[in-house]
Swiss-Prot record:
The chain crosses the membrane at residues 34-54, 78-98, 100-120, 141-161, 181-201, 212-232, 252-272, 275-295, 301-321, 350-370. It comes from the Bacteria. This is Phospho-N-acetylmuramoyl-pentapeptide-transferase. Its EC number is 2.7.8.13. Its cofactor is Mg(2+). Belongs to the glycosyltransferase 4 family. MraY subfamily. The gene is mraY. One of its GO terms (cellular component) is plasma membrane. The keyword Nuclease does not apply. GO terms for biological process: cell division; cell wall organization; peptidoglycan biosynthetic process; regulation of cell shape.
């Protein structure tokens, strides 16, 4: 929204001569920093009030898994739905600092709010029923897929229209380590993109099981994709690195700046012992947001590297469930895999910090693919 002030100075001589500082709003880097600080400030200021309100309204808070580690029972009574704080920071900050005429920004916010609403309803059912069983799995996935498909459709059409006539770039998948090889999926790209976004949302959701475990890797992924979005949206940098130039995606760096700021604010309250959990409200929204940016920038496969920790968590659940159905035995002591390490004797802080380290290493590997071609 603030970028419009800079555009206003192009048409009104008074603004262009007396308010030259408005030109700062043209720069993505400046607005990214502004979005970061704004979202962090929003969460810091309103976080305590939101936590107090949720604690009163929820009573017993988020239910604790009966088969989980014994150390988790001391967390009983901790309120959930802390994702509301994160969403408030991201959305308000993005509305202020991002270009709302940008299709990629609108699509990303659509997925973020849509997935956040689904997660909120899931959290609401869990709290009111005092059960870890919330929204019907199939219904939830169906709604997520519809929202994601709508976003991907509009992003794909935007990419197709911004390219040369006859270009299939918008409906194609790019591969790391290859300069020009792309696989055109046609309209099936909508299904592929939606699958990526839904998978990302649920992978982050599965990771959110310990204090601070999910939010820091999310910020690491957001920072990584902030760099990717900025480079992919800049022709000079994209040409130099031989990555796909996607006009308009640089604006997503502003939204990702808001994610980092909101994440920092939330971590202040989520640091162990957590005063609040983000719940599905936050984890689904954040994962969906990262997935949408990956699809927009044509770095879906790179996301599997940068977000490898989330992939590992999701795979551990898939393997555990699948193997148990076939053999009635378990591969892990408990899934997702962070609980497996708790059962092995790692303290919660050891699991969290070591997983953070893994997330940093994977992000560095993922970013290195931008140059290794």
């Amino acid at each position: 929204m603030l970028i419009w002030l800079a555009e206003l100075s192009d048409h009104i001589h008074f603004f262009s001569t007396h308010f030259r500082f408005l030109n700062l709003f043209r720069y993505i880097t400046f607005r990214t920093g502004g979005a970061l600080f704004t979202s962090a400030l929003i969460v810091f200021l309103f976080g305590p009030r939101i936590i107090s309100s949720l604690r009163v309204r929820q009573g017993r808070g988020q239910p604790i898994r009966a088969d989980g580690p014994q150390t988790h029972f001391k967390k009983a009574g901790t309120p959930t739905m802390g994702g509301l704080m994160i969403l408030a920071g991201i959305v308000v900050s993005s509305l202020l600092w991002a270009d709302l005429a940008n299709v990629y920004v609108v699509a990303t916010l659509l997925v973020t709010l849509g997935f956040g609403a689904i997660g909120f309803y899931d959290d609401y059912l869990k709290v009111t029923k005092q059960s870890d069983k919330g929204f019907s799995g199939r219904a939830r996935l169906g709604l997520e897929f519809i929202i994601a498909a709508i976003a991907v459709y509009f992003m794909m059409n935007t990419a197709l229209s911004s390219g040369p006539a006859g270009s299939t770039f918008g409906s194609s998948i790019a591969f790391p380590f290859f300069k020009s090889f792309m696989l055109n999926l046609g309209m099936f790209f909508v299904l592929f993109g939606a699958f990526v976004i839904v998978s990302a949302g649920n992978a982050v959701n599965l990771t959110d099981g310990l204090d601070g475990l999910a939010i820091v890797p999310v910020m690491i992924a957001a920072a990584s994709f902030g760099v990717i979005a900025y480079l992919a949206g800049n022709f000079v940098f994209a040409d130099y690195l031989a990555i796909n130039f996607v006009p308009g995606t640089g604006e997503l760096a502003v939204v990702l700046g808001a994610v980092i700021g909101a994440g920092l604010g939330f971590l202040w309250f989520n640091a162990p012992p957590a005063a609040i959990f983000m719940g599905d409200t936050g984890s689904l929204a954040l994962g969906g947001l990262i997935g949408t940016v990956a699809v927009a920038t044509k770095h879906e496969i790179v996301m599997a590297i940068i977000g490898g920790l989330f992939v590992l968590e999701a795979l551990s659940v898939i393997i555990q469930v699948g193997f148990f159905k076939m053999t009635r035995r378990r591969v892990f002591l408990m899934a997702p895999i962070h609980h497996h390490f708790e059962k092995k004797g790692w303290t919660e802080s050891q699991v969290v910090v070591r997983f953070w380290i893994v997330a940093v290493i994977l992000a560095m590997i993922g970013l290195s693919t931008l140059k290794l071609r």
